[in-house]
Amino acid sequence: TGSMVRIKIKRENVKRGSGEKNQFLFPIGNINQLTIYPMNFGEFLFNKNKLLYDLIIDSFNSKMALEDSAHRKALDIFYDYLLVGGMPEAVDVYLKTGSFQKSREILVDLYDNYLADMQLYQASPESIARAKKIFENIYTQLNKESKNFKTTLIGKKLKGRDVRSPIDWLSLAFLLYKSSLVKEQVTVPLTDSDESIFRLYLSDIGMFSYQSGINATTFI
């Protein structure tokens, strides 16, 4: 939640020696933290068609191929998931009404609320503007030939250091995921990565679908 993001930011500032006059005391023992993510496809399928979900699990465990009809049905539901995404309210509306349009309206509200909420936690107007631009720019970044994040698409004169803090905040709030380039073949968990070359992904595929400009009703 937003309040938890604020607490985490305060803790990070204290760790980094931000020079805040008032000492920040984390309420140990009074807060239970639970990270909630958008629903993945398995969870979406479980709620959409539990019989098919169970069939897929059984087929996987027994190492048997799905029948073509079941496979086609699963693909159809997967395409639905790509449009609806995994935000619980959007999924709930879609499952109850079968309407991509009504589900998309929920997504638009959530998307706009995310943007509006960013101004509560940024240190400066510049940081607010950059965080919003980064969030709104994810599809554009991934739709170009090189999928790697390009700072100049956020601002022509900006450097990597200028967007580091907004990206850190967006990651901390679980609004996006950052994937850095691994320098060499992964053999151990501690393999170094190149932090200057990375890609950003929205945490919810439905919001990514909305950001792409795809009209959900086109696929009905």
Which residue ranges define each predicted feature?
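Interdomain motor-coupling "hinge/lid" segment immediately C-terminal to the ATP-binding subdomain
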Residues: 2-3, 8-143
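Accessory nucleic acid-recognition modules appended to NTPase machines
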Residues: 92-220
